[in-house]
Amino acid sequence: MELYCTRPACPRPLNLFSDLDDPATLKRVPQKYCTTCGMPLILADRYIPLKLLGQGGFGAAFLARDRYTPTMRQCVVKLFQPSGNLNPQQLQTAQNLFEREAEVLEELGNQHPQIPDLFAFFQLTVPSLQPGKQEQFFYLVQEFINGENLEEEFTKNGKFSEAQILEILQQILPVLQFVHAHGSIHRDIKPSNIMRSRKGALFLLDFGAVKQVTKVAASSASSTGIYSMGYAPPEQMSGGQIYPSTDLYALAVTCLTLLTGKQPNELFDTYNNQWNWRTYAQVSPRLANILDRMLLSSPNQRYHSADEVLAALTLPPPAPPVQTTA
């Protein structure tokens, strides 16, 4: 069985242990250590990382198994390990965001079927690769969603149809309605953060940038600047106050990129400060108008809530004009 070392600096993270092919041994073995760097491989005595799923500036995500469940269920282990060029204030901000993600997943994910559940959050202190020093690692463990994100779907299948976009809106807007009702704003909606499970349900992922609405006014002057370029609206990019409509804007940009096959910077006219996307997509005037309103630069002019967008989507289409004869 292959186990993956979660130490970011490990030069050879893959470890093969043939004795762990036996499930009984896997369940009772006290610990296994990386044969290259000595890092403990079984995390919190139960989570067994198998492979790297992805990594970014603040850490990495691993596919793992929980050996204390009857089926040794799959899960995702996220490691917080930011890049080494952060100053102490930036490092603390990054750590706070990681802890916030765990808090939000515990509060929201365990209550909503389209947000991953949180299973664990813990710290591990181990000897550093530098003699005489210690390293601290922070982990969270969450539900594994077996499927593809919308970015992967687009890469495989090409542009989305209007019917597919309507399905995305009808599935994700109720999730946002739930998130906003619990006092949070996601702040990082984009195709790669929406995952479709094998059963077809859409999940909202990556709550690392979430912000509590109740704390926005007090902290807006010192925004952390966490956003994805092109998907974030003006108020978020300028570090100003954010709203539920901030997420609606990002969801609309997500829809545009999937409809047109173009990146946000190819669709936004910076000279005239407007979105020019309609010539690249064939959609009904009704959907186009809804997306355009979600994309208005002023938060006050957009729909104020996910409820309002859902209501606009469910309204009957206007009746055709009646032609009268003189």
What does each model-found stretch correspond to?
Residues L50-G57, A61:
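Protein kinase glycine-rich loop
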Residues P88-G109:
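AlphaC helix of the eukaryotic protein kinase fold
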Residues D117-F138:
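Short beta-strand micro-motifs within the conserved protein kinase catalytic domain, predominantly
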Residues N149-F160:
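AlphaC helix of the protein kinase catalytic domain
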Residues I168-L169:
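Activation segment signature within eukaryotic-like protein kinase domains
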Residues H180-R196:
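Catalytic-loop of the protein kinase fold
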Residues A209-V210:
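Activation segment
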Residues S219-E235:
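Conserved activation segment of eukaryotic-like protein kinases, specifically the C-terminal portion
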